[in-house]
């Protein structure tokens, strides 16, 4: 039952015409996005618990944006839109969090999460697309 549920979740936006490589990339990105959702929510709760209420909105906005992009992808099956939305979210959320926390000293290594944007471009698109990120 669990395997069937996971397979169904990873089949969001499935297109019967996609190649095996496209299917793998789609399922991987959907899986990564779904796994990060609860972590982003908990991350926001931790900021809230330590009194950083404004900063808590950053990971919660990431979770909301990610969920919306997944819902849009489920309807439109436009992988490029999902990929771009996820890359923008993973680039902007940590940068905003770092700024809101007062810079690099106060935010520790939160900014390092931004490195996932170019890595995502390599993994889910083609390597040449990593440079703009």
Question: Where are the model-predicted features located?
Answer:
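Short, Lys/Arg-rich, polar N-terminal cytosolic tail immediately upstream
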Residues: 1-22
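Hydrophobic transmembrane alpha-helices and their membrane-interface boundaries in multi-pass
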Residues: 28-106, 110-120, 133
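The cytoplasmic-loop to transmembrane-helix boundary for the fourth helix
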Residues: 124-133
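Intrinsic-disorder/low-complexity, polar/charged segments
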Residues: 15-19, 78, 102-103, 128-129
């Amino acid at each position: 039952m669990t395997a069937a549920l996971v397979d169904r979740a990873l089949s969001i936006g499935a297109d019967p015409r996609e190649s095996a490589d496209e299917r793998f990339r789609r399922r991987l990105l959907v899986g990564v996005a779904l796994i990060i959702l609860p972590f982003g929510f908990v991350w926001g709760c931790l900021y809230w618990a330590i009194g950083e209420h404004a900063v808590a909105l950053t990971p919660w906005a990431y979770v909301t944006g990610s969920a919306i992009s997944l819902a849009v992808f489920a309807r439109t099956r436009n992988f490029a839109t999902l990929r771009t939305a996820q890359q923008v979210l993973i680039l902007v959320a940590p940068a905003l969090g770092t700024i809101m926390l007062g810079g690099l000293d106060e935010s520790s290594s939160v900014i390092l999460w931004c490195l996932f944007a170019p890595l995502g471009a390599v993994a889910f698109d083609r390597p040449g697309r990593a440079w703009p990120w």
